[in-house]
Each structure stands twice: as C-alpha cells, then as structure tokens.
C-alpha cells in the first residue's frame, strides 16, 4: 500500500492500531520498571541492583535491554499487521552501519518512526519522565502520533484531521490562551542540555547555556536580550517536551540535536493541536524573515504552543511574534546533517 492509496478509512484503522500499540508498549515499559520495584521490595535490606545500560555515543547517550525489547515488540507488531510499511526505530538505526543510515525520512511508502523509550536516562533513575513514541508518516509527514508515558498515566494521541487528545477524552490544548504580549516574558520555556557536552567555547553546550541565560535574565539585561521567562524546564525527554507544549503547559520549546524518532509523534500531536513549529536557528533577518516549515530530520526545532487570538492579533500572529522574540535571544546551534 503506497501513500497515494491511504484512504480515510485506512488511516482510521491505522490510528486505532497505533493507539493500542502505544498502550501495549507502555505497559511493557511499566512492567520492566515494576520489576525493579518488586526486586527492591524483596531485598529491602540488601543493596539494590542497578539498572544496566550500554553507552552509545557518549556517557549520556545510553541504551538498556528494555529499549531493545520494546522496539522489537513494536516492530514485530507493525511488520505483522502492515508488512509493506517501512520502519525506522532508534535502536535499529543505531545498530546499522554509518554507510547505510538514512539521512532523512523521505520514503514515499508509509513509514513508522519509533522511539521505544525516550528518556532512557530518566528511566534508569526511575524519574517518571519517560515514554514510548510511535509515529506514522505519509509522504514523509507525520500524520499519526502516539506518546505513552506509563509512569505518569498519560497517553497523548493525534491523527490528522481528528484532533489531538490526552487519555483519549481530553481535547488538546487544555486551554487556548493568547500568547503573552511580553513574550517570551510570561512564558514557560522548555529546553534540554543535550548529549553534546564538548567543553568548547563555541560548542553547542556553551551556545545553549548562553541562550538559556538570555531567556531567563531580567528585561533589559544581557545587552537587551533578557527575556524574563516565567521558568525554564528540562524534562530529559524531547518527546514529552513536545507533548506538554501541545497540551499548553509549556509555551515554548527550543532544541537542537534530536532525531526523527524523538520528534515525529510529538510533531503530529503538536500540529493537530494547533501549535507552530519551525527551525531553532535564527535567520540573519530574524525580525522580517519568512517563518519556514520545519524539516523533520533537520535536528533543529522551535515550537510555540497552540494559542488563541487577542484584540488586534490573530493566534498565528501571536505565535509568529513569539518565535521572532525567541530567535532574537538564542544562538544558532551547530547540528548539521546532509539533506537537511
């Protein structure tokens, strides 16, 4: 089945399948976590065993057996139900050779993009901000997104034209308020430290920290770049950053370094809820440049929550104004990728 023959009825069926698959995969994550709880209860007076993991590209880029088991479960279910569909999973991709890794999702056939456990570091520390992320793409565009955060009891779902939902009953966003007139002032700003920790004055870590301080500093500070945001949040999960922006709990998410599986499901949910997503890196003419659509594989993302209109400003105008004010305060990040 090619994307040209994916009918509305078929998309509904795929959506139903994806939602159930997300629930089942979330249950597997929770079962693995509970096993650690039960082992600790049974051996309360003894030293607890630690969660074993393997480093990939760095000490903060890790994989557990749970990551691999859950991805294998998801991939098997998809291959059984939709054998003609393509599949890209984080762990499958990581194990492929550099020469065979695809740069971008440009498949003309329907494609599933999966992160079996986003927030692996959180999971190893039993911090509840971890989830499974499942996206379905048509012509390279996310049209279905499912994010299950089992320890939080939260399920985020969306299908193009059918709305975005929390736990299948609450429409997203929870509220649709205008963007603050002083944005980024009055906003909750979400960002991540990332996995690039190289100690270089012009490295991504330093650029991020400078941007964080600009966003947080008092108005008039930092050479006029002080944003005085209400707060800065870092969840350790790009997928959940997107979900909470779609929910309206975060006003802004700014990030570089993510991959397709980190963001595909969240983008589907965010856009269906009415959020706006573009490139994290500011153009030279940030005040007047056209705000481009994000490229899924670009690794550079700036997101503004769903918004409502205000007197004299449409919702879209408020979102675009906020994007420009963020661009004015952040550094360009160095995450290059062929084809992006």
UniProtKB/Swiss-Prot annotation:
SUPFAM superfamilies: Carbohydrate phosphatase. Disruption phenotype: Does not affect carbon mediated repression of qa-2 and qa-y. Mg(2+) 1 binds at residues 90, 115, 117. CDD domains: IMPase. One of its GO terms (biological process) is quinate metabolic process. Belongs to the inositol monophosphatase superfamily. Part of the qa gene cluster that mediates the catabolism of quinic acid (QA) and as such, allows the use of QA as a sole carbon source. Its function within the pathway has not been determined yet but it probably plays a regulatory role. The qa cluster encodes 3 inducible enymes (qa-2, qa-3 and qa-4) catalyzing the first three reactions in the catabolism of quinic acid to protocatechuic acid (also known as 3,4-Dihydroxybenzoic acid). PANTHER family: INOSITOL MONOPHOSPHATASE, PROTEIN QUTG. This is Quinic acid degradation cluster protein x. The gene is qa-x.
